[in-house]
Amino acid sequence: MIESITSFGAATFGGWWPLIWTLVRAVCIILPLLLCVAYLILWERKLIGWMHVRVGPNRVGPMGLLQPIADVLKLLLKEVMVPSAVSRGMYIIAPLMVLMPAVAIWAVVPFQAEAVVSNINAGLLYVMAISSVGVYGVILAGWASNSKYAFLGAMRASAQMISYEIAMGFALVTVLMVTGSLNLSDIVNSQNRGFFANHGINILSWNWLSLLPMFGVYFISGVAETNRHPFDVVEGESEIVAGHMIEYSGMAFALFFLAEYINMIVISAMTATMFLGGWSAPIDAPVFNWIPGFFWLLIKVFLLLSVFIWLRASFPRYRYDQIMRLGWKIFIPLTVGWLIIVAIWLVSPWNIWK
């Protein structure tokens, strides 16, 4: 289907077609992403409500389904107040610097075979590079706000993101070692091989089982990277109110939250791609194979996002020193140790990734 669309477009628009096709693919990513963020927030409020034995949002529309629309309209109608003491240019550009990397990562995330905006061979390297850029927007927001609370939150955010970026990087290196490719589509395809895949049990051939410690480290580090509970000391309400966002209001404030929820979806999608077989069905059987791969990826992302929400409802916020200790004294040594084990495993006679 995609090949027929591209051939028709090339014949119709000529030299303009590559630009038009890129814009169409970008719109097809951004608009559903915004819709997913809106209803992810509703799902979060509903799920936490059920866990707290409450009802959750149920007033706007049937069963509260229009609540995200009401929230967006409320934020759009609020005035963006710019305090007089801030560095105006950097204050305004900081939310965009946080949001743009979160959106840019989706250029290389494969939704199913051949369904990717840009199927580049260095996709994994691209993800690691772009995901580390968002911290600059957070630091800029804290510094430009000219507030001690905002600056303290920005310093916490930068230290926390840098600390857990190392563990996430080592976890992804192990995936690179066992797959031998930086292309995300190749990483998904490489998980459907081996003893279990040959017998139709794809779920046991995915990387989550053979790289179980890396799977846990990557996902938990992703929770810390997104400053989500229980790692949300960056915006600890009882200490520094809203952290680096304290001087923001209206849509400028909303852009930070939009970036946070997009990053949650990014971490879930990358975890599903790296460790849970991406768009692959768990069992190689006709009853599963007729379902498009996109829906399998969607189910995995939804379950991982629900784990994000479950963590928020179940765990208390960690102290800042506990967060740093977990990253530097547990996760980094664990990932380095497992990296060495995988390297030895690959050259041994018991290599299961051949």
Swiss-Prot record:
Biological processes per GO annotation: aerobic respiration
S-S bonds: none
Keywords attached to this entry: Cell inner membrane, Cell membrane, Membrane, NAD, Quinone, Translocase, Transmembrane, Transmembrane helix, Ubiquinone
EC code(s) of this entry: 7.1.1.-
Pfam assignment, any one: NADHdh
UniProt topology in membrane: Multi-pass membrane protein
TM stretches of this protein: 23-43, 91-111, 124-144, 162-182, 203-223, 250-270, 291-311, 330-350
Highest taxon of source: Bacteria
Alphabetical list of InterPro entries matching this protein: NADH_UbQ_OxRdtase_su1/FPO, NADH_UbQ_OxRdtase_su1_CS
Cellular compartments per GO CC: plasma membrane
Cell compartment(s), UniProt: Cell inner membrane
EC category name: translocase
Catalytic activity: a quinone + NADH + 5 H(+)(in) = a quinol + NAD(+) + 4 H(+)(out)
HAMAP family for the chain: NDH1_NuoH
PANTHER family named among the record's database cross-references: NADH DEHYDROGENASE SUBUNIT 1 (PTHR11432), NADH-UBIQUINONE OXIDOREDUCTASE CHAIN 1 (PTHR11432:SF3)
Similarity section: Belongs to the complex I subunit 1 family.
Function: NDH-1 shuttles electrons from NADH, via FMN and iron-sulfur (Fe-S) centers, to quinones in the respiratory chain. The immediate electron acceptor for the enzyme in this species is believed to be ubiquinone. Couples the redox reaction to proton translocation (for every two electrons transferred, four hydrogen ions are translocated across the cytoplasmic membrane), and thus conserves the redox energy in a proton gradient. This subunit may bind ubiquinone.
The protein's assembly and partners: NDH-1 is composed of 14 different subunits. Subunits NuoA, H, J, K, L, M, N constitute the membrane sector of the complex.
Protein name: NADH-quinone oxidoreductase subunit H
Organism: Ralstonia nicotianae (strain ATCC BAA-1114 / GMI1000) (Ralstonia solanacearum)
